[in-house]
């Protein structure tokens, strides 16, 4: 009897500094997915960007200790060939690399082997080369359905500068900020404080998980923060500190997105840094649901969906915002201010995205099921749109009509 299960490629790892976070998220997705409905193929991306066919038991064994989690050695390399009938093929095993053998060494090379066709890809990737539109573009070229926002939504949300400008133009409040395009052009500490007040957050424009983010309270802090941020990106944001509560909302859907109940992050560190998120088990208290009145809860959910739509998101995203407890420039106390939108949020044991949906009545396996169905529905919708092939046929028909007249 043929296997009727949907075949899902779980794509994880990657080149970004958030590699380990991706591995932790992938472990949870792999363990939670309904095996009666889905047949999974593990595709690991190493730190050099190479794709590998990963063995599930080996990966889960290496992932059992979060302090030593790593992508295990995999002998089979993979390549994706784009087109309307995409193929994932195995290539020369890793053991041949570095052997000194040339392409014409005379030794017979193994023929590429094609893997069974995948129905959908679940990218469990974080940061650059994962959630910034690059992988999404490759999968779109291959006509492979994939979970999460498309190329535009992924790219826009990854770039904090572009995202904030689009949100601001849509009438959605964001923290006052300055964009710096090179270390040499950075304003002095006094100039930055005059524009934004102190303390100031310094952030790489295109990183996630608070990687490279610093809070500057003095000139010395500021100079170190700039050096650190520019080591991760060529564009850096200087951002005014919003004094308030950190609220997070999970959003799910395509044309008609839904918002979860709000949760709250109460950091025990100076801010919710990478260390607080992933290295210190006591780095923050996660409060679900957030202690908000009904009116504020409704406002928060509404602005989360507005932001999701304004930044062209589909599938899923986690919307991070502040509930201001003090006035911030023109924004009064009580304002809801968007911090950022994470298009491929974490799925680790402490991650808010699945936790918020679980508290909203959507279990982890059901959430994965809905995300996969949304990916397939979107791909089917997009495939119905007119293509260059379709337009060529229309053009030829019109040309024939014009000639016959």
Task: Identify the role of each PLM range.
Residues 217-302, 323-337:
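Phosphate-binding site of ATP-dependent enzymes
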Residues 167-168, 193-211, 233-243, 247:
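ATP-grasp fold ATP-binding core
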Residues 40, 145-146, 174, 200, ...:
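Hydrophobic beta-strand scaffold residues
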Residues 1-147, 151-152, 156-158, 162, ...:
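ATP-binding N-terminal substructure of ATP-dependent carboxylate-amine bond-forming enzymes
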Residues 2-6, 12-15, 35, 171, ...:
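ATP-dependent carboxylate activation and anion-phosphoryl transfer catalytic cores
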Residues 166-174, 228:
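Basic phosphate/pyrophosphate-binding loop/patch that engages nucleotide-derived ligands
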Residues 22, 174-179, 200-224, 246-248, ...:
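Glycine-rich phosphate-binding loop of ATP-grasp-fold ATP-dependent ligases
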